[in-house]
Every structure is written in structure tokens, then in C-alpha cells.
Amino acid sequence: HASSWGEWKKDLGKDLDLPKGQIRKQLTPLLGYGCLDPSRLGFSARNRAVVIAGGSITKDQRHTYSLPLPLSLRSKAEWHRFTVTLAFAAPTVGTLNQYRGSKVYFEYKEDGTKTAKRSEAEPNMVKKGSLQHEIIEGTRAMTFAEGDAFSIHVECMDDAQHLRKKEEIKYALVASVETAEQTSTTIYDEVRMALRMRARDHVRGRVQG
């Protein structure tokens, strides 16, 4: 989750004289998901919030996760980034060239984040393995209401073989939102508070029901 291309996209795109519209497609096989940044591992930051989830999913099922949008990012024309990483335990088929037995992938809903775009690995290529890692970032102001979220939809489908009915595929999901320290130092606190309120409302609803 702490991997990125850094300055390689700009530098290699220039050095290799790649067409602007082809840079990501040409560099993805070469760079993959980029270089791991050890400084981001095991350390918290007030301008970044990380959420970890996971579970088991069956064919044609969808699981939706909602990462609260921090109000301190609203209507600010400043750099912001969403990073989403999905890994799953795919059953394998050794007798076929297309050995991945199932496909689990995520899509995201751009509530208030239409100004942020995928910036690194090519979106079709990232779905070819069992690890999908995408960075969505931008600098234009986001417009959203209190309580809005960055929604991530995890889905499952057949690939090289037909999954048996109710056959479960295990997966793990990590999502984060961040901005520069000079823009906001309350991202972590805002997301934590929103998640706590959501959990409290969920419990209250179950008790009343």
C-alpha cells in the first residue's frame, strides 16, 4: 500500500520520449506498482488516514466499503490522494495458460472526488493479477456534503474456471486518504470520528430494531 512511482513517471516518460497518452500503459509493465517507501510503514500521520478491511466473497457478489471524506478537504484546491490496495487468494488452474480461477477486483464511486483521477498503473492491467493497487489523486477542489464518502466496491466473478455455488474467495483491502500537512492536520481524527459515529449508529439501529 506504500508503493508508488514517485518521479519515475515524469522522468522516464521524458527520457524514453513516450507519447503523453501512452505513458502509463507503457510504464506499467516496467514499473509495476513502483517502489516501496519504508518511511510510510508503521508510522501514523495526522494528514493521512488508513482503513483496513477484509472478508470472503462469492461469485457475482458485491461488498461496498465507505471511506469518510474529511470536511477539511472540502472546496480546497489542494493536492489530495486516495490509495486503494486489494489482494485476494485466487484458486489456481494449473492445466490452463489462464491459471487464475477467479477474479476479484474493486471499482470506486466518485462522490465528490470527480476532480481526482487514476495517476499511475494502467487501470486495465492492474486487474490481471491477484493484487490491485491504484492511486487516485488531484489538485482541484472537491465538492461534497457532510457524511459523504469515497465508496469502494469489491466484486467477484469467474475467470479460468466456474466457481462453485457459495465458494468463497478470501480478500484483504486497504484504503487511505491523505493531503499535504500544510493543507490539513486533522484527516486522521476526522475519519476516525466519522467511523466511530457510523458504528455507534449501526449498533443503535440494531438495538432499536
Describe the role of every protein-language-model region.
Residues 93-135:
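Surface-exposed beta-strand/loop patches in noncatalytic accessory domains
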Residues 12, 76, 171-175:
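Long internal repeat-built scaffold domains in very large eukaryotic proteins
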Residues 19-110:
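Secreted peptidase-domain scaffold signal
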Residues 101-113, 140-209:
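C-terminal edge strands of extracellular/lumenal beta-sandwich accessory domains
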Residues 65-71, 127-142:
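Exposed aromatic-hydrophobic patches
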Residues 13-18:
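Structured alpha-helical bundle/scaffold domains in large eukaryotic membrane-trafficking regulators
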Residues 10, 92-94, 160:
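Residue-level signal for secondary-structure boundary sites
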Residues 1-12:
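Hydrolase catalytic cores
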